[in-house]
């Protein structure tokens, strides 16, 4: 962690510059300039997701170049709007001739200009904070200035431009933490590689399934992992089956495909339960014991739509994580395990196994900052979904694609 955030230094320098410019142009020009600047930027933010979806594959992960282009487009559109309204403001300001009024006008102009700059920085930063871009994303997430702005704004502000944020943050995983929240990563020793070769991991294969389905709402084939937790019942992540009407499961990722239906869809926790009546596979049991820091664990699943893959893991710690739900409709608090583990797309929905083959929790995300850190919902967090999912057999709406 750097002692001084470079982005914060740039924002403070920009604030001084905008204050000087605002003082010179005055409140009347400044407020109209702000309206034009924010208006142009908001138009770009609203249109970019629509344009992006038309010219790219929905599953495409956003590159650094695309993010930079998106930010430049927003700034250019904001500047065009600002130029137009500033011209109108200059014409109006010529009519202010009383000296005290001009002092108030100048001071107000400095304040308005700085506020506008910080709001636009927060808007762009909120979107960049959800990306896994090296350096840039981390600088944004660690910004004290942007954190301060976010604390002043209403709690629901993070959901105002969710389409734009989701477009830039396509990583295949939900966000665990709110923008500008420091991700707490506890140092522990590396996982024991022998766990990946243990008989427990091989035996669990009979209860772990590959989940595949087509989501018409975004024309994507979604793939992930699930596991049998009760007769004919499979637990996975909600984002694995978001918008999927007829998911199929495959025991161990091989052989026969079994048709299932979504009977529980908890988009806030990111948990779904599938009813697969013809599935004959032993159920994994959730443990009643909590994992402690440095506890051994196993991550098993089908990353990147591949074959059965087992990785040793070690629990870093247990966290109450505040972050957006999978649709960015609001902020939720999740009880999660932070893991020293390799988690890839396709691991979503898989079990976090104990060394004796029980289930600590459900793998659902990976770190934006550290490639060796993943996250799992704890057994306590999903306890209500376990109880309801066991007795549910009616199809529910799986809404639309989440990520």
Go through each PLM region and give its residues.
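Generic structural signal for well-ordered beta-strand positions
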Residues: 29, 235, 360-361
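Conserved active-site neighborhood of the chymotrypsin/trypsin-like protease fold
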Residues: 215-223, 230-309, 393-398
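Active-site region of chymotrypsin-like
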Residues: 205-212, 272-283, 309-402
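A conserved glycine-rich beta-strand in the N-terminal activation segment of trypsin-fold
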Residues: 25, 194-199, 207-231, 257-259, ...
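Alpha-helical transmembrane segments and their juxtamembrane interface "caps"
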Residues: 1-193
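Sec-exported extracytoplasmic/periplasmic mature domains
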Residues: 56, 93, 112, 129, ...
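Short loop/turn motifs at secondary-structure junctions and domain boundaries
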Residues: 11-12, 216-219, 341-344
């Amino acid at each position: 962690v750097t002692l001084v955030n470079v982005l914060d230094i740039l924002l403070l320098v920009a604030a001084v510059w905008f204050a000087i410019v605002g003082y010179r142009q005055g409140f009347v020009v400044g407020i109209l300039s702000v309206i034009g600047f924010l208006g142009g930027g908001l138009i770009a933010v609203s249109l970019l997701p629509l344009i992006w979806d038309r010219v790219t594959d929905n599953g495409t992960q956003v590159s650094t170049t695309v993010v930079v282009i998106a930010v430049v487009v927003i700034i250019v559109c904001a500047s065009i709007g600002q130029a137009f309204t500033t011209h109108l403001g200059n014409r109006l300001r010529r009519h202010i001739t009383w000296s005290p009024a001009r002092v108030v006008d100048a001071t107000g102009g400095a304040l308005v200009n700085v506020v506008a700059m910080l709001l636009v920085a927060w808007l762009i930063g909120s979107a960049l904070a959800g990306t896994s871009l090296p350096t840039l994303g981390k600088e944004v997430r660690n910004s004290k200035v942007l954190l301060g702005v976010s604390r002043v704004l209403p709690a629901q502000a993070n959901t105002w431009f969710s389409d734009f944020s989701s477009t830039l943050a396509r990583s295949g995983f939900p966000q665990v933490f709110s923008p500008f929240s420091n991700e707490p990563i506890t140092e522990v020793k590396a996982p024991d590689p022998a766990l990946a070769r243990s008989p427990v991991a091989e035996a669990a294969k009979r209860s772990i399934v590959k989940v595949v389905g087509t989501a018409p709402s975004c024309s994507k084939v979604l793939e992930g992992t699930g596991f049998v937790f009760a007769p004919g019942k499979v637990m996975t992540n909600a984002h694995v089956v978001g918008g999927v009407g007829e998911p199929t499961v495959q025991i161990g990722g091989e052989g026969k495909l079994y048709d299932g239906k979504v009977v529980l869809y908890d988009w806030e926790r990111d948990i779904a339960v599938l009813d697969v009546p013809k599935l004959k596979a032993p159920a994994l049991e959730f443990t009643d014991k909590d994992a402690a820091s440095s506890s051994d664990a196993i991550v098993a699943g089908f990353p990147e739509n591949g074959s059965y893959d087992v990785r040793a893991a070690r629990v870093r710690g247990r966290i109450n994580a505040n972050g957006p739900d999978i649709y960015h409709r609001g902020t939720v608090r999740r009880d999660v395990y932070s893991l020293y583990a390799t988690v890839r797309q396709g691991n979503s929905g898989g079990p976090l196994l104990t060394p004796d083959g029980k289930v600590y929790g459900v793998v659902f995300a990976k770190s934006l900052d550290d490639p060796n850190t993943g996250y799992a919902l704890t057994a306590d967090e999903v306890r209500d979904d376990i109880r309801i999912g066991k007795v549910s057999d009616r199809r529910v709406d799986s809404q639309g694609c989440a990520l």
